[in-house]
Amino acid sequence: MEVTRKADMKTVDGPAGYFTGKATITGQFQRPDPSRVSGAIVHFEPGARTNWHTHPLGQTLIVTEGIGWTQVEGGPVHEFHAGDILWCPAGHKHWHGATAHAGMTHIAIQESLNGSPVTWMEKVTDEEYLRGPAGKDQ
């Protein structure tokens, strides 16, 4: 059994090439073969979000704090809250992040295929992002 203590976890800024706004990544892990699991705790300041991206075997997000938005390409923006669990199926182009006015933290868990857990794509435009969920006042 391997135990990683919170005090030993490193926090890094989310790379500007993959995130818009201020995001931090804590406790990033990649398990050794034969496991394909990787993950991290990701915190988004208000207005921060990922680029569009896909996961070859899907992704689970466990929301631990705040309020966020997510969208699968071509679909509506969905709002989620602390305590919610999100599943994005394999290959679905999507983004996720904080709302425009509230921060959000989630634990992201995904598996790698051929050594890669994610394919990063273009940035989510401000216009796409600020649409927010249907029926919500921005």
Give residue spans per PLM region:
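Asparagine-centered strand-capping/turn motif at beta-strand->loop junctions
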Residues: 97-99
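A short, N-terminal "cap"/entry segment at the start of jelly-roll beta-barrel domains
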Residues: 1-37, 117-138
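Glycine- and acidic-residue-biased ligand/ion/polar-headgroup-sensing regions
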Residues: 46, 55-74
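Conserved short histidine dyad/triad with adjacent acidic residue
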Residues: 27, 40-55
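A short hydrophobic beta-strand segment most commonly corresponding to one strand
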Residues: 60, 87, 101-121
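Short acidic-glycine-tyrosine-enriched beta hairpin
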Residues: 74-90
